[in-house]
């Protein structure tokens, strides 16, 4: 059991201050108060002690001649450090760039009108972030897609402003949506001053609509037939193209030139291009065996 009394009876008490240690020679004693030992446990013995930093190589100074060459090279080559290194001759690229950085900071702080080469453009990202469309953009109102006729596959309508207005005015089935959406347009401001009318006064809606319809009529009169009845084809009709090329080798078929003139321009260009490639391939030495085979067929047909 543990005794509650801090000093049990009969237990000797030792006082360290009165104790003496034997001297090194065995004749005297050294008092304990004369020797103090302090141990600091705050430092971690496992931490690695950093070695003192010593400068092994002295910093190379730039002479006035080297600095003048550096300034001249800046005017000639801007930030092409390799060419500046070759021009200076006695400094490396690392030393030149370090010197240039210090020189640029010094010029910017002093505000002197010295020549500083423009910074190099940053590399463009291979996958740039998508640019969001600005919120405050005035979109021109066009007729709804339900009022326009469906386009045939393989055709493309011209996208310039005049033909677009012509297609809208002639090909639209009804004009109700056009009149409805034209009211949402911003009111234009008068550019030419008229007597009795303010220069910044907006025009009435009826007048704007009347002028727009007159412009549409004036634009759509000459190209009504071209815009709606005869659109331009984007892709050639390969069925017609290969049918014509096959008929060229048919001895019972004639009138190839007339048929070629009646084709669409893109079909005609495709036929001519394929026939030209065919003639080049047949004249090349790689197809000598095929030519010999074709000539044997023609000889059999003549017999």
UniProtKB/Swiss-Prot annotation:
One of its GO terms (cellular component) is nucleus. This is Protein REVEILLE 5. Residues 54-108 form the HTH myb-type domain. It comes from the Eukaryota. GO terms for molecular function: DNA binding; DNA-binding transcription factor activity. PROSITE patterns: HTH_MYB (PS51294). Keywords: DNA-binding, Homeobox, Nucleus, Transcription, Transcription regulation. Residues 109-130 are annotated as: Disordered. The keyword Transcription applies. Probable transcription factor. Gene3D superfamilies: Homeodomain-like (1.10.10.60). Residues 81-104 bind DNA. It is found in: Nucleus. The gene is RVE5. SUPFAM superfamilies: Homeodomain-like. Pfam families: Myb_DNA-binding, RVE6.
């Amino acid at each position: 059991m543990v005794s509650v009394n801090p000093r049990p009876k009969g237990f000797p008490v030792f006082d360290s201050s009165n104790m003496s240690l034997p001297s090194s020679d065995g004749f005297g004693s050294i008092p304990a108060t004369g020797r103090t030992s302090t141990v600091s446990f705050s430092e971690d013995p496992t931490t690695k002690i950093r070695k003192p930093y010593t400068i092994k190589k002295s910093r190379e100074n730039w002479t006035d001649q080297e600095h003048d060459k550096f300034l001249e090279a800046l005017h000639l080559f801007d930030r092409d450090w390799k060419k500046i290194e070759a021009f200076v001759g006695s400094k490396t690229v690392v030393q030149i760039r370090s010197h240039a950085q210090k020189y640029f900071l010094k010029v910017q702080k002093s505000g002197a009108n010295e020549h500083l080469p423009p910074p190099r453009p940053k590399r463009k990202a291979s996958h740039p972030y998508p640019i969001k469309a600005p919120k405050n953009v005035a979109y021109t109102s066009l007729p709804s897609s339900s009022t326009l006729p469906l386009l045939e596959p393989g055709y493309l309508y011209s996208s310039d402003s005049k033909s677009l207005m012509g297609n809208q005015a002639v090909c639209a089935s009804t004009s109700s949506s056009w009149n409805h959406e034209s009211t949402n347009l911003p009111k234009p401001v008068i550019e030419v001053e008229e007597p009795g009318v303010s220069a910044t006064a907006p025009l009435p809606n009826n007048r704007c609509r009347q002028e727009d319809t007159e412009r549409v009529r004036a634009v759509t009169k000459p190209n009504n037939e071209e815009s709606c009845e005869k659109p331009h084809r984007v892709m050639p009709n390969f069925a017609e193209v290969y049918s014509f090329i096959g008929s060229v080798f048919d001895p019972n078929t004639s009138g190839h030139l007339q048929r070629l003139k009646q084709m669409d321009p893109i079909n005609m260009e495709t036929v001519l291009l394929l026939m030209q490639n065919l003639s080049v391939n047949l004249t090349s030495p790689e197809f000598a065996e095929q030519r010999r085979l074709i000539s044997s067929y023609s000889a059999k047909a003549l017999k």
